[in-house]
Amino acid sequence: MNIAAIRPRKIAVIGSGIAGLSCAWLLNKAHQVTLYEKDDRLGGHSNTVSFDLKGQQVDVDTGFIVFNPVNYPNLVKFFEHINLPTCETDMTFAVSINDGQLEYSGSGLGGLFAQKRNLISPPFWSMLKDLMRFYRNADNMMLDSSLADISLGELLQRQGYGDRFIYDHLLPMGAAIWSTPVKQMLDYPALSFLRFCKNHGLLQVNDRPQWHTIPGGSIGYVRKIAAELEGKVRLNSRIHKVIRQPEGVIIEDLHGAREYYDDIVLACHADQALALLANPTPEEQQLLSSFPYQRNQAFLHLDQSLLPKDRKTWSSWNYMASGSGLDDRQVSVSYWMNCLQPLATEVPIIVSLNPLKEPAPEKMIRSFFYDHPAFGRDSLANQQKLWNLQGHQNTWFCGAWFGYGFHEDGIQSGLAVAEQLGGIPRPWQLEEPSSRIFVTDLLTQENDGTDRLEKANG
């Protein structure tokens, strides 16, 4: 495509997570782009922290950490395109319940039976039996149309899975992946859960995908995009409202200052996008309000008491739980970052999400809040309708909430918006470039009587 033939449009992108960054990056090749970010840094969940430890600088991620080539095809192609170094990493998983009363990891027999009493524990063997049954039956369950409208909890009850498998393995894994309380995982749509686990190789013992990370942290790709957008980024920019008019869009900041744009891309969370729109349409109100969020506090620290008691079970992801009730257990996840990233220290560096107790003050480094989509039946059903919002009143939406809530979902939505709004193809080829989100071809849709791509191409 001859990018020089595209008539440049003045476009605002709101939000600098992976969706906003990728969208602005591609649009910038032919259009006048301004990227707005309310915080003092770019990246959203790509948040690398640098700190000094015993005279050595350590760079560690606290949000986005890992990806794999099978399930993150656009992210891999993007990293290759910008020549970003990556390396293989480990993705082991451990469980520690009630201060170490039950502990095991998935790293072979030594991890499963790190506690010798697990060898002679009938409930533990029952958990393993159910685990293998779940793996074995997953494909057939995904083909069962009667499961289309039931929750994960209903599926597990219907199939007769035991509490030990449900509460000591499956829900801990789900809660760790989605940063979601156990009770919410039970309400997660069953087929969506199964498809995600199947696609990510979580329903098999062997041949799981090889995971990768970015040496030096995800700040590496953020800096590369920022360099291309130099002079077009506005940090600490809190927008009061977005006003749509027939001829374009007005952004008004907290001080009442206004700026006009031809188009706007709301690359923020669904609830944030809805709050910014001065006069949302009924469809925008209905769809965007159906995506609730879970606020999670992350602590970067050195407190090893927030890892399993038995060091032999320490893993990349460590699920920690406490409480006698199964549904209302206090749960958290601690990431052993030395296992996940090549760090310049052997001192255990830990990121704990919603820990059962706060790290000791003298071992604390930083803390952050991250919001994650808490998908339910309504939100997952409404994902199929989200693309109907695109382009109306010169307004576009993207974000990881268009898919499963991960980096690949964010970049797929950001690039798809840039392609349809800006008329610029991504600089790589994939058989299914939007495999994780629902995208429709706007060439068949009308927007105020003007086709989007015709407008972009003049």
Task: Give the predicted meaning of each segment.
Residues I6, R238-D371:
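Mid-domain catalytic core of redox enzymes
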Residues S50, S107-G108, L326-G458:
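Conserved flavin/dinucleotide-binding core of flavoenzymes
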Residues P69-D187, L194-R195:
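Mobile amphipathic helical/loop "lid" adjacent to a hydrophobic cofactor/ligand pocket
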Residues M1-I11, K29-A30, F51-D52, L380-Q384, ...:
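Extreme N-terminal leader/targeting segments of oxidoreductases
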Residues R9-L35:
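N-terminal Rossmann-like FAD-binding beta1-loop-alpha1 element of flavoenzymes
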Residues V49-L75:
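N-terminal glycine-rich dinucleotide-binding loop that anchors FAD/FMN and/or NAD(P) in oxidoreductases
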Residues N28-D52:
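Glycine-rich FAD pyrophosphate-binding loop
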Residues R195-L254, E259:
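Helical element adjacent to the flavin cofactor pocket in flavoenzyme catalytic cores
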